[in-house]
């Protein structure tokens, strides 16, 4: 059965309409940070989780999903040691972990692998994180999309977003 688009899907579609590729990634990362958590396919065990990775042009990409149902959908009929095979990490912690030396370290993120997938290089992720922290995103001040036009800013303010 086809999945109904959620708010994240709508942001992905908005990003696709943007002519500037860097701005597209800003929209996607802004939408990712608005999520309560990032979800990863666990190919390890419950005791020793291991997020699924892939390789694109020699780069280690980490598969990240916008919700747990997408992870289960991606797992399909495959058998994994942990059931359900989902790792859930709060969005701010996941952003930091992807840039650090830990388990989630990667060269790029592959967001929602499949038809509407987006690849976010590590450099873009690091630049976003720096700006996000500089604007107090880490303090929980809310959803932020960098480089909004004044009309977009007005829209968000008028609608209390």
Model-flagged regions — what are they?
Residues 1-161:
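An interfacial alpha-helical scaffold signature
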């Amino acid at each position: 059965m086809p999945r109904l688009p959620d708010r994240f899907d709508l942001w992905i579609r908005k990003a696709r309409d943007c002519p500037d590729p860097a701005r597209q990634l800003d929209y996607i990362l802004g939408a990712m940070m608005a999520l309560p958590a990032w979800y990863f396919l666990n190919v390890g065990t419950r005791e020793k989780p291991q997020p699924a990775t892939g390789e694109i042009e020699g780069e280690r990409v980490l598969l990240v999903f916008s919700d747990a149902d997408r992870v289960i959908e991606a797992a399909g009929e495959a058998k994994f040691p942990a059931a359900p095979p989902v790792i859930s990490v709060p969005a701010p912690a996941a952003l930091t972990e992807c840039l650090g030396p830990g388990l989630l370290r990667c060269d790029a993120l592959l967001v929602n692998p499949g038809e509407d997938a987006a690849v976010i290089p590590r450099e873009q992720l690091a630049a976003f994180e720096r700006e996000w922290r500089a604007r107090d995103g880490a303090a929980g001040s809310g959803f932020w999309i960098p480089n909004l036009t004044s009309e977009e800013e007005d829209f968000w303010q008028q609608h209390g977003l």
